[in-house]
Amino acid sequence: MPTFSLWLPAGSNNVHPCGDPYAHHLFMRCLYHAKHDPTMKFDVKTTNVNKTSQEFKNTGLRRMPGISAEESGETQTFETEDDILDFLEYLKPERGDDEEAENATCDLFRQFARFVKDVEHRDTAFNTELLRLDKYLSEQETKFLISDDVTHIDCLVLTRLHSIRVAAKMLKNYEIPADLSHVLDYLKAGYATEMFRVSCPSDQEIVLHWTELKDTPRLSAKDRAKLVREEPVFSFSV
């Protein structure tokens, strides 16, 4: 079993991870695998993307997120999304049958991005995807997507869904409808999970991430500075 470091872009304080849901997903995935394999050893490191540390440069990685792994005295690096996810797929436990769950969630993030970027001015398509997820969850007899325990796909969907929830409220004054009770119960189950909470960025970092993307609503310099100065908030209740 290799020892590895997960490198993530630092957030506004140059210490804690940024609010990118992909970074949150990878952090949670690593915690998930570590929970199931006590021999697995990894750490999480951050650095400013605009002024990377010498330690990061020494790994040979050129971008983040990335993984630097040590095995038998040799160092390997993984920095494309496909390479990182392929590396994680070799870790225990094996992936379960999550094809139906993938089908129920595959368009949710894309439709939210279209909504928040005003490609879609109405929330209709986004709501349709949330309803699709709610229907899928209503037909399951499990706390999570395919099991009563977190699996690979939950690490992806929960982190995205939380990012969506926080950003939608701040940037579009949108809240997940109360009648989508299965989606809200799913989020509650995620929020009660230690690996989710440990890996989760603050609400402020999530908002900063979204407002720095192309075509998304921008914050004024004053509002951005206010967010950075605030005590970190973690919205773990719905």
Curated annotation (Swiss-Prot):
Function: Probable chloride channel.
One of the GO BP terms on file: chloride transport
Tissue distribution: Expressed in the intestine, neurons and muscles.
InterPro entries documented for this protein: Glutathione-S-Trfase_C_sf
Gene for this chain: exl-1
Organism from which the protein derives: Caenorhabditis elegans
GO terms assigned for molecular function: chloride channel activity
Localization, UniProt: Cytoplasm; Membrane; Lysosome membrane; Golgi apparatus membrane
Protein name, as recorded: Chloride intracellular channel exl-1
Chain coiled-coil ranges: none
